[in-house]
């Protein structure tokens, strides 16, 4: 099981998966001892570099106010863009939207430029996948989100806009946390030579994250399983 996920699981997540697969109830301390005895260790996340955002055009208050829970799907969405470097020095940018109810990635887009269209495409995909959603939509103060055209998109679905305070990345904590997970469990483990190679790996990882990566806070389920369980209740 450890090799199946390329060594990304620590003892707590390994405990969830062992118990789920074997229908047992092993204590996490026992799994920790077993993993330690055979030198199994999870990959460690790297720290994120933060940048100062200047001269926004349209801003909003921090309506979310670090209330990182939601009672139902599509109640609160978080978004952000992160950067990847290819082996030849070129860059790629991933935009994603995370639902706070189940921590699922409801939409994402990968591009060669960090521009408005990347963010617009991500938002449009989320709306198409979740018709009728009117979420609280939280982001940082990046220029794509302070764009008047993006504000019009939010108004078009009657979404409430919320923004992190300047320099306070913790205001978007779960989104930042997802970037850390994705990079430590996928990106930092290998080199990517082409944009297409990176895109394939990201597609595979987000599918894994949404459908097979069990989370204790989701009652031991993967994000989409927890989401679907709520939708049919």
Where are these regions (language model features)?
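Basic, flexible linker segments flanking DNA-binding modules
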Residues: 1-72, 168, 222-230
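Hydrophobic (often cysteine-bearing) scaffold residues that line and stabilize catalytic clefts
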Residues: 7-11, 27, 60, 74, ...
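Mobile genetic element proteins and their domesticated derivatives, centered on retroelements
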Residues: 14, 31, 35, 64, ...
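RNase H-like two-metal-ion nuclease catalytic core shared by retroviral integrases
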Residues: 53-55, 139-141, 147-150, 163-183, ...
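An active-site-proximal beta-strand-loop segment
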Residues: 66, 70-106, 112-113
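Active-site beta-loop-alpha junctions of metal-dependent nucleic acid enzymes
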Residues: 90, 109-130
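Short small-residue beta-strand/loop micro-motif enriched in glycine and branched aliphatics
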Residues: 102-108, 161-164, 188-189
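C-terminal domain-tail junction helix/linker
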Residues: 155-159, 181-233
